Amino acid sequence: MNAKKWDVYVYGDVNIDIVIPGVEKFPEPGQEDEVSVMETFVGGGAALFTLGVGKLGLHPVFQGEVGDDCYGELIRNKFRESHVDDSLLVVSKELKTGISLSFTNEKDRSFLTYRGTNEKISIVNVDVEKVKEAAHIHVTGYAGSINHNEYLELLKKIKAETQATVSFDVGWDSTGEWKPEIRDLFPYIDVLFMNETEAEHYGRKESAEEAAREFARTAGMAV
């Protein structure tokens, strides 16, 4: 029987996604257009992973930040409905909850994003003392050379000081560097998540499958 307080500890981004489908063009200045539907969801890779874990019947905790506003309240309610412990979720009095507007049509998508409380995200804020109370930690927000050293230091500390297994969702490298140093992290990762494009870039291989096989030689599992 698992004696840990939480099944999964997640730190990272949470925001509101407002999705507006069927947008073929934007209104001219001074004009107004109507849309048939506009939908609101909880977004952010870390938050979505946490919600998914909660819906599977596990007991996750989420550490992040929202604003003291209606969207922050919506997020907290969604977490509670999905059996997510929000005791580590900070409510900011300074910044508003992040919002991403998604304009979609059959051909493409465009986004407008206000980062809001997600501006404060930094992997150095992960509370290793809290991680000790979890069976597993899910890590997101890697940005290549921008925060590589911080990630390496954290993963080493987690392996040395806790019993938690580690999953790592790499994400897109906004710097465009795709540096091979990411492999330094793999020995400390039990489950490595990458999409096909990310795997091909980081693996410098012709196929994601070939890259995944190579990654799995040092990481526990590449998905």
Identify the function of each model-found stretch.
Residues 51, 99-103, 110:
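Short beta-strand scaffold segments in enzyme catalytic cores
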Residues 2-16, 78-91, 105-223:
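Ribokinase/PfkB-type carbohydrate-kinase core domain
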Residues 95-97:
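Short acidic/glycine-enriched loop/turn segments that link adjacent beta-strands
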Residues 29-37, 74, 100, 122, ...:
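Short, surface-exposed, charged/polar-biased interaction segments
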Residues 1-65, 70-81:
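Glycine-rich phosphate/adenosyl-contacting loop at the front of the ribokinase-like
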Residues 42, 64-67, 93, 143, ...:
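Structured beta->alpha junctions
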